Amino acid sequence: MRILGDFLMHYGVPGMKWGVRRKTETLFVSGSSKTQDPLSGYYRRKLPRKIRKELKYAIRGGQRIIVGDAPGIDRQTQDYLRKKHYSNVIVYGPGKQVRYSADKKWKTRPIDAPEYKEGSKRWLAKKDIAMTNDATRGLAIVLDEGAKATRHNVSRLQRQHKNVKVYELSKYGKRKDRWW
């Protein structure tokens, strides 16, 4: 995978812009459950501008967006999509029912994992694995160094040869926007 200006050359898709995609694509939004800005210490009330821009591209393209039901980035993404009156959204949640869906008209997909203890990391990871399998590309938002689940989602998408764009805000003051 190489980046050439704004264009991505990845697994036989030369010159395709990140924001210009087909309607058949599914964007998996993954992020930290903590929304505290490591630089200022304040809690973010809305998504960073770059993330909103990426979501606007997906909305314009009519892509399906899949997002989790956890607090933090998942909830902020859902609130943003509801504010934009976007309907092509599927909310995934662990267990027998989804914990939070910003719009009752959106489809929901509960992922039950009775073989694992409820609330355990493996129980939660089952939902992330299903989302990774259903996505054609990913957008990951890392706001703290401890976002292990988000990093696992990025590596799962990479192993399946799917494009992932990572927005990282580290506690060392460096805002990064990069491909992994």
Language model features with spans:
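Acidic/glycine-enriched connector segments
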Residues: 31-178
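Charge-dense, intrinsically disordered terminal/linker segments
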Residues: 1-25, 178
